[in-house]
Regions:
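Beta-propeller domains with acidic blade repeats across secreted/periplasmic ectodomains
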Residues: 1-292
């Protein structure tokens, strides 16, 4: 598919087809003759995010165990019937990407809150949008005040690093700068104690943070930092910007590194960050992203 503007979501389907989210459209595109080009392109929905908005808007397309294709930061998710795809209304939840555990619970996050869980399917609350409280849906598993990150380099290039107490004495951030892409590790090629545990990326601080889930025995989950003081992956390179993690077929997982100096969407950049970017030439050298 060519001439897409800011495509932000992609889901491979059978029969050489795929779902492609390119605001404002969600396409169902198929390669009918095997030349790796989309010969057919059907618009399933024309309300998939807004053009020109990078940081906010529909994304995800995570295929859950209940056959729902979950969408984050949007007011519907996608379902399939004998007649094709259709949307189902939900409450607006999450910011960037989605994961699921072995029990089918859906996880999201937002900004500096690393992990939320749906104990209850959002379909039930969507039956009555007049409900004020939606307990059990998008439940916050760890408070910001209880979570700490440990970058291995000073991180002055944060959007609000000018604030008092934003940085430690060594110049590193103590809390998330912009967490996204929660992933429950469900593979078998990492140590057993990590299996079933959540990881989140925090590209502004150049790291991937490992959390641990605990169950109180009554089905209530809580999250905590896996390491008292440390990270599973961290870099001294300011351009290391992990933005996504994907489970791999071989029991490991892939890391998508945007590898660029700027990680904050321009309309939301503070004057402090704009000056920092200009002083350090961080807007230069684009198109160097990589996969681990």
């Amino acid at each position: 598919m060519d001439n897409l503007i800011l495509p932000r979501s992609f889901k491979v389907l059978d029969n050489n087809c795929a779902l492609v989210g390119a605001p404002p459209n969600l396409f169902h595109a198929c390669d009918t003759d095997g030349d790796l080009q989309a010969d057919t392109r059907e618009i399933i929905e024309d309300t998939f995010s807004e053009e020109g908005v990078l940081e906010h808007g529909a994304n995800g397309l995570y295929w859950g165990m209940d056959n729902t294709i979950n969408v984050s930061e949007h007011n519907w998710h996608l379902k399939i019937s004998e007649d094709g795809f259709y949307t189902s209304p939900i409450h607006w939840r999450g910011q960037w990407l989605i994961s699921q555990d072995d029990s089918g619970r859906i996880y999201r996050n937002v900004n500096s809150n690393p992990l939320h869980v749906d104990y209850i399917s959002p379909d039930y609350y969507a039956r009555n949008f007049n409900l004020i409280r939606t307990t059990g849906n998008y439940y916050n598993l760890i408070d910001q005040s209880e979570a700490e990150i440990w970058p291995i380099r000073p991180t002055p290039g944060l959007n609000r690093a000018y604030r008092a107490q934003a940085l430690r004495e060594d110049g590193s951030a103590s809390y998330y700068g912009g967490t996204s892409s929660p992933m429950i590790f469900r593979g078998d090629r990492l140590p057993e104690e990590i299996q079933g545990q959540p990881l989140v990326v925090d590209s502004p601080t150049n790291l991937i943070h490992l959390l641990k889930l605990e169950d109180d025995g009554a089905g209530n989950l809580y999250a905590d930092d896996f390491y008292d003081r440390g990270e599973i992956i961290a870099s001294t390179d300011e351009r290391f910007r992990p933005v996504h993690m994907v489970p791999s077929w071989d029991g490991t997982f892939y890391i998508i590194d945007m590898y660029r100096g700027v990680s904050q969407d321009y309309p939301y950049q503070t004057n402090y960050l704009k000056n920092y970017i200009e002083e350090h030439g961080l807007a230069d050298h684009r198109g160097l992203g990589r996969v681990y």
